[in-house]
From Swiss-Prot:
InterPro entries: SAM-dependent_MTases_sf, UbiE/COQ5_MeTrFase, UbiE/COQ5_MeTrFase_CS. It comes from Cupriavidus taiwanensis (strain DSM 17343 / BCRC 17206 / CCUG 44338 / CIP 107171 / LMG 19424 / R1). HAMAP family: MenG_UbiE_methyltr. Methyltransferase required for the conversion of demethylmenaquinol (DMKH2) to menaquinol (MKH2) and the conversion of 2-polyprenyl-6-methoxy-1,4-benzoquinol (DDMQH2) to 2-polyprenyl-3-methyl-6-methoxy-1,4-benzoquinol (DMQH2). Disulfide bonds: none annotated. It comes from the Bacteria. Belongs to the class I-like SAM-binding methyltransferase superfamily. MenG/UbiE family. This is Ubiquinone/menaquinone biosynthesis C-methyltransferase UbiE. One of its GO terms (molecular function) is 2-methoxy-6-polyprenyl-1,4-benzoquinol methyltransferase activity. Transmembrane segments: none annotated.
Length: 243
């Protein structure tokens, strides 16, 4: 059997999906509050930058993978308009339910689907844009997921990955203290769940750095891959194209 990482823990590949699902079932109801606390609200600016770079226009078809509580899908649905199509998807039913309800409460009706990014249930060359924000690091076979994203995007379209990355070196020690001490403490105080937030910190540490992710996207068949460091590399936005 093949092994993979669940945070720092080595587990069988068949176990990882269930363990990740357990984390997000646990955090779903407090996800937005915790995002604001953990990032000091910066996650909103990171997503705004992603939305600006996406360039969604009326009539566009957009797939938001691991869309969680729907921040990107909400913006894209407004930009794509009634002639467009924006799918909010997530592999976790609890997260998808929170995202769907949040969009409905804002008066936004857009299709939602449970979706495994390694087996995307859409035809080839269907979307103008595919996005995944803070979800790739939780996937077992990242290159396979990226190849699937490339498959369903149209020639001329983009795949965009917004994810925690390698922080600027002078900030590493302070960032580690925050990630492994403060973050689990916040998780316990606000959500009553320190272990899930400890996993989130560990999953960030185990995720490929900026250059490694460029190579991974290129291996998946994407071209002209570039990245933008945000907040000293705490987060990076990677953009790959299909021709």
């Amino acid at each position: 059997m093949s092994e993979t990482h669940f945070g720092f823990e080595k587990v069988d590949e068949t176990e990882k999906a269930g363990k990740v699902a357990g984390v997000f079932h646990s955090v779903a109801s407090k996800y937005d509050v915790m995002n604001d606390l953990m990032s000091g609200g910066m996650h909103r600016l990171w997503k705004m930058f992603t939305i600006a770079q996406a360039g969604v226009r009326p009539g566009h078809k957009v797939l938001d993978i691991a869309g969680g509580t729907g921040d990107l899908a909400k913006a894209f649905a407004k930009q794509a308009g009634p002639t467009g199509q924006v799918w909010l998807t997530d592999i976790n039913e609890s997260m998808l339910r929170v995202g769907r309800d949040r969009l409905l409460n804002k008066g936004i009706v857009t299709p939602v689907a449970l979706c495994d990014a390694e087996k995307i249930p859409f035809p080839d060359n269907y979307f103008d844009l595919v996005t995944v924000a803070f979800g790739l690091r939780n996937m077992t076979h990242k290159e396979a997921a990226l190849a699937e994203m490339r498959r369903v995007v149209k020639p001329g379209g983009k795949v965009m990955v917004l994810e925690f990355s390698k922080v600027w070196k002078p900030l590493e020690k302070a960032y580690d203290v925050y990630s492994f001490k403060v973050l689990p403490w916040l998780g316990q105080r606000v959500a009553g769940d320190a272990p899930s937030y400890r996993y989130l910190a560990e999953s960030i540490r185990m995720h490929p750095d900026q250059v490694s992710l460029v190579r991974l996207m290129e291996h998946a068949g994407l071209e002209n891959v570039e990245y933008f460091n945000l907040t000293a590399g705490v987060v990076a936005l990677h953009v790959g194209r299909k021709y």
